[in-house]
């Protein structure tokens, strides 16, 4: 049976009311976050009281709630609803070209790229948008690309229990493009395989081939 391929170009914004991850430190309030932004403006040499920056602390705090919305996301909730009546389909399900953004945990500057995610169902499949939502849950945090890749694969494997999961991420890191060596246009590729994708080379080849199709 031929594998099904799906291309995702839709906006997959996360709901903001999902279960929070465990935090070691008490979460500061909105006023404290805005005060921190004001401090940074002063530190870089700006005047936070000039007209163009008066609302900036509020805007930045609000933007960060969206940009880092992954901390309030739960892959268990997203992948909790599955479909078992899939007419016996048990071949690869691949959702490719899932656009995402993240932020480097070292410098807090953007990582921009796309993810390709495949799994081999074991009697259960999920709605295609759910895969993209899982990508966003882990991407919208302070991250490394290696961690995002592994976390996506691990959550799908752990929750859906398929015969295998394959994840490839291609991304450009602004910490390389905007600072230090300043190499614009360079990309980083990371992969994680579980189950049949890890144990069977032909499944990896199929995955890679379908991504490039």
Curated annotation (Swiss-Prot):
Classification via Gene3D superfamilies: 1.10.286.10, 3.30.1130.10
Keywords: GTP-binding, Hydrolase, Metal-binding, Nucleotide-binding, One-carbon metabolism, Zinc
GO CC term (a single one): cytoplasm
Keyword Magnesium found: no
MF term (GO), any: GTP cyclohydrolase I activity
Keyword Cell cycle (UniProt): no
Catalytic activity entry: GTP + H2O = 7,8-dihydroneopterin 3'-triphosphate + formate + H(+)
EC number: 3.5.4.16
InterPro entries from the UniProt entry: GTP-CH-I_C/QueF, GTP-CH-I_N, GTP_CycHdrlase_I, GTP_CycHdrlase_I_CS, GTP_CycHdrlase_I_dom
Enzyme class: hydrolase
Residues binding Zn(2+), per UniProt: 104, 107, 175
Gene Ontology annotations of biological process type: one-carbon metabolic process; tetrahydrobiopterin biosynthetic process; tetrahydrofolate biosynthetic process
Pathway, per record: Cofactor biosynthesis; 7,8-dihydroneopterin triphosphate biosynthesis; 7,8-dihydroneopterin triphosphate from GTP: step 1/1
Recorded superkingdom: Bacteria
Oligomeric form and interacting partners: Toroid-shaped homodecamer, composed of two pentamers of five dimers.
Protein family according to the UniProt entry: Belongs to the GTP cyclohydrolase I family.
Protein name per Swiss-Prot or TrEMBL: GTP cyclohydrolase 1
Organism for this UniProt entry: Brucella ovis (strain ATCC 25840 / 63/290 / NCTC 10512)
């Amino acid at each position: 049976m031929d594998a099904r391929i799906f291309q995702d170009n839709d906006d997959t914004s996360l709901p903001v009311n999902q279960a929070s991850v465990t935090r070691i430190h008490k979460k500061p309030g909105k006023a404290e976050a805005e005060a921190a932004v004001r401090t940074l403006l002063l530190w870089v040499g700006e005047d936070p009281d000039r007209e163009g920056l008066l609302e900036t602390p509020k805007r930045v705090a609000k933007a960060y709630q969206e940009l880092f919305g992954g901390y309030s996301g739960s892959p268990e909730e997203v992948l909790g609803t599955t479909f078992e009546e899939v007419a016996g389909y048990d071949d690869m399900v691949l959702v490719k070209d899932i656009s995402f953004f993240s932020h480097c945990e070292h410098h807090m500057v953007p990582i921009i790229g796309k993810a390709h995610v495949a799994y081999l169902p074991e009697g259960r499949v999920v709605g295609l948008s759910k895969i993209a939502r899982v990508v966003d849950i882990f991407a919208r945090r302070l991250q490394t690309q290696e961690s995002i890749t592994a976390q996506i694969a691990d959550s799908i494997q752990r929750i859906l229990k398929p015969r295998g999961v394959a994840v490839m991420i291609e991304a450009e890191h602004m910490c390389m493009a905007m600072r230090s060596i300043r190499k614009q246009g360079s990309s980083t590729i990371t992969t994680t395989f579980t189950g049949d994708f890890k144990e069977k080379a032909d499944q990896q080849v199929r995955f890679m081939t379908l991504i490039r199709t």
